[in-house]
Amino acid sequence: DCLGWFKSCDPKNDKCCKNYTCSRRDRWCKYYL
């Protein structure tokens, strides 16, 4: 299971879905281009 858009996440343990990345500043998954 992965985390989608605007889901809170841990930058050290990035479980965001494919094409998303965990923002270190905001601590939620952002779309990654």
Swiss-Prot record:
Domain of life assignment: Eukaryota
Keywords of this entry: Amidation, Calcium channel impairing toxin, Disulfide bond, Ion channel impairing toxin, Knottin, Neurotoxin, Secreted, Toxin, Voltage-gated calcium channel impairing toxin, Voltage-gated sodium channel impairing toxin
Residue runs in coiled coils: none
Disulfide bonds: 2-17, 9-22, 16-29
Subcellular location(s) of the protein: Secreted
An example Gene Ontology molecular-function term: toxin activity
Any one of the GO BP annotations: envenomation resulting in negative regulation of voltage-gated sodium channel activity in another organism
Leucine amide PTM sites in chain numbering: 33
Tissue expression: Expressed by the venom gland.
GO cellular component: extracellular space
Chief place of localization: secreted
PROSITE patterns hit by this protein: HWTX_1
Family of this protein: Belongs to the neurotoxin 10 (Hwtx-1) family. 04 (CcoTx1) subfamily.
Miscellaneous remark of the record: Negative results: does not inhibit Cav1.3 and Cav3.1. Does not or only weakly inhibits Nav1.8/SCN10A.
Function: Inhibits several voltage-gated sodium channels and only one voltage-gated calcium channel (Cav2.2/CACNA1B (IC(50)=1.1 uM) and Nav1.2/SCN2A (IC(50)=3.7-80 nM), Nav1.3/SCN3A (IC(50)=88-5570 nM), Nav1.1/SCN1A (IC(50)=170-407 nM), Nav1.7/SCN9A (IC(50)=95.5-230 nM), Nav1.6/SCN6A (IC(50)=49.9-3990 nM), Nav1.4/SCN4A (IC(50)=113-400 nM or >10 uM), Nav1.5/SCN5A (IC(50)=1524-1634 nM or >10 uM)). The toxin acts by shifting the voltage dependence of channel activation to more depolarized potentials and by blocking the inward component of the sodium current.
Protein name listed in UniProt: Beta-theraphotoxin-Cm1b
UniProt source species: Ceratogyrus marshalli
